[in-house]
Amino acid sequence: MMRLSFTSVPKYLDIKTKPKVLKPGEEGHIWAKFDPRKADDWGFMIDRLKIQVNGKNVNRNLFSITAKIVEDFSDLSPEERANAPKVKFENTTYDFGTAKQHTKVSYTFKFKNEGKRDLKIRKMRTTCGCTTAEPESTVILPGEESSFKAIFHTGGRSGYQRKLIYFITNDPERSTVRLTIKGKVIK
């Protein structure tokens, strides 16, 4: 007989197995319930839980759970949408041409809140640890302009590179903006 349990389960996940104990040849199910209100995060998330068999850790037994947390704007009235924040970027792509290995490429992305309510930056996520980006401010008033510097560390990479930054806000028409830094890294 086999009983599964999980370690490192975050507070926003509820994991259950059915049946609780598997008999030889029997099938079971793992149920995962995700509560985004408890996650305090936005955008793509991944959690890797270790599976224990009969209370013991087993090498390479990982259970991955992914989710994409987005704001629900479906209840907004037409008036609320008309008065909502609106993010407008000067540029969403920066082509740095060529850069040498083990250097830094930086670019300042500029944007404006063209809406009538405060624009809130929920999260900025890069697709590679080699790229960093931090906003100057997380609340942009109506009509206000702001910017942030994105830095790509070329490291030992070579060839064509394309790094993405996901800019997540409370703009109901464009809650996630994908920004790109691209170019060729040479020796």
Model-identified regions with their sequence ranges:
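Surface-exposed binding patches on compact interaction domains or structured appendages
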Residues: M1-E27, R117-E144
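Short acidic/proline- and small/hydrophobic-mixed sequence motifs that coincide with surface turns
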Residues: M1-L4, V58-R60, K116-I121, Y160, ...
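Short strand-edge motifs at loop-to-beta-strand transitions and within beta-strands
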Residues: E26-A32, Y94, E144-A150
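Long, low-complexity ectodomains and other extracytoplasmic segments of secretory-pathway proteins
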Residues: N54-K110, E114-G115, P172-K187
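C-terminal soluble interaction/assembly domains
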Residues: T108-E114, R122-T126, T131-I168, T176, ...
